[in-house]
């Protein structure tokens, strides 16, 4: 009898544990900032592993401060075009608490303000956060990470951004769109895939060689990968009046950065690197860096360095075109290695510095005397088209018929990569030999999804 009773109690306890471990779904039923049915109340009530979904549309306007996520939860929105959470420029939107694992999908986060702190839209506070199909926009602060601050300093933090847009955010110091922080021996990982980082800015005062870095993204000692994405129309620094500032309008990297199948375009700074400023480890493959500029002035003299890239870089199967600097190289100012890459019409010069040629490059000028490897072509027009939709998720420069880049790449190349910048179905080797640059000339596959169109933004509210 005692054994039977003991067994029965054990079964009941087991069932209770199983029931407790089962995830619950809590549905947000109104757009109030607090009270029953609100998102804030749902986040108060959840347990680890629960799901928060929504039966509402419109805007949740925050009036009681940031939304704290202090459980490991899934927040599943109805779509970024359907529901927004607005900080009203009075508070941050989301704060993901330390040690938690969270995911947010299908929401727009807007109007976040961190004040003098970091992360206007989101603070990922030593947590693991995945964002999918979201928009983070019109947020900022006087510190770091206007849109998102991924804090792994003296600890760890991991941020994954998928199929999302980070746009029109501002930070006074660095990381207008995103700041990835691995300072003080920390570990911060940032992964961006199939996403757009555009129209963000970082600006500070006119301190010589300081202030306003990483208009789009700033990576401070962390591990960062960007794949199938666009970083465009970001800005960094100020023109003066005493001394221009700013570095890495698109990206400023002080860690390890790998860029693959992506486009860095039309970013502008006033001192170092319109496109990418590197003071760490930088690898760019199957990508396009185009139309970026560094245009500072000092005492009436040009002062912009490296329109496309400044620093050490390993650059392969890529295209650098039409970048501008008013003082030094429009393309690359720095060192590293370059192979199977097009350098076209970067004003000033395509390269300033000492680069090791891996061979099979084409330069519209003499390449600064660096391109002496096998198959290198200098003072040669690569014959490329404008930056446009040529298929795939990002904009590219197509090779025109008759281009000297066609079938002129490394004859010993074998995949991977299996596809050019546009990804499947655009193979990396067509007609027996790889082309030079990020684009492989081949018939257009009309079924390939076009680059995501940017929704027409609403008028930008005046910050309070």
Briefly describe each language-model feature range.
Residues 19-21, 291, 311, 438:
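Intrinsic disorder/low-complexity segments, especially N-terminal tails and targeting/processing regions
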Residues 21-118, 124-127, 132, 137, ...:
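N-terminal, post-signal-peptide segments of secreted/periplasmic proteins
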């Amino acid at each position: 009898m005692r054994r039977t009773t003991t067994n029965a109690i054990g079964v009941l306890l087991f069932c209770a544990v199983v029931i407790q471990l089962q995830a619950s779904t809590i549905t947000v039923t109104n757009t109030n900032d607090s009270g029953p049915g609100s998102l804030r109340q749902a986040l108060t009530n959840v347990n680890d592993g629960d799901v928060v979904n929504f039966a509402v549309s419109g805007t949740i306007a925050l009036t009681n401060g940031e939304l704290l996520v202090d459980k490991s939860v899934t927040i599943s929105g109805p779509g970024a075009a359907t529901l927004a959470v607005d900080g009203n420029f009075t508070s941050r939107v989301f704060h993901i608490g330390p040690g938690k694992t969270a995911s947010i999908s299908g929401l727009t986060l807007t109007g976040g303000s961190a004040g003098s702190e970091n992360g206007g839209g989101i603070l990922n506070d030593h947590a693991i956060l995945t964002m999918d199909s979201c928009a983070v926009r019109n947020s900022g602060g006087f510190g770091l990470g206007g849109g998102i601050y991924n804090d792994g300093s003296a600890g760890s933090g991991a941020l994954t951004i998928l199929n999302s847009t980070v746009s029109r955010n501002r930070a006074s110091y660095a990381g207008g769109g995103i700041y990835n922080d691995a300072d003080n021996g920390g570990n911060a990982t940032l992964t961006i895939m199939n996403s757009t980082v555009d129209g963000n800015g970082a600006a500070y005062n006119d301190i010589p060689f300081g202030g306003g870095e990483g208009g789009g993204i700033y990576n401070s000692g962390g591990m960062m990968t960007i794949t199938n994405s666009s970083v465009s129309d970001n800005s960094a620094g100020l023109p003066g009046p005493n001394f221009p500032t700013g570095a890495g309008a698109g990206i400023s990297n002080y860690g390890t950065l790998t860029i693959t199948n992506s486009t860095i375009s039309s970013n502008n700074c006033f001192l170092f690197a319109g496109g990418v400023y590197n003071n760490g480890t930088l690898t760019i493959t199957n990508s396009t860096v185009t139309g970026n500029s560094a245009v500072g002035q000092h005492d009436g003299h040009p002062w912009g360095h490296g329109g496309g890239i400044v620093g050490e870089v390993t650059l392969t199967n890529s295209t650098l075109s039409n970048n501008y600097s008013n003082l030094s190289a429009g393309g690359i100012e720095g060192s590293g290695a370059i192979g199977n890459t097009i350098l076209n019409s970067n004003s000033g010069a395509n390269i300033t510095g000492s680069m090791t040629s891996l061979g099979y490059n084409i330069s519209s000028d003499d390449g600064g005397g660096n391109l002496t490897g096998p198959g290198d072509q200098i003072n040669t027009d690569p014959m490329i088209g404008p930056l446009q939709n040529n298929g795939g998720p990002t904009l590219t420069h197509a090779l025109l018929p008759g281009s000297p880049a066609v079938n002129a790449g490394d004859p010993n190349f074998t995949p991977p990569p299996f596809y050019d910048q546009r990804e499947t179905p655009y193979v990396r080797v067509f007609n027996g030999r790889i082309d030079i640059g990020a684009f492989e000339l081949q018939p257009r596959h009309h079924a390939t999804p076009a680059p995501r169109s940017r929704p027409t933004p609403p008028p930008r509210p005046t910050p309070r």
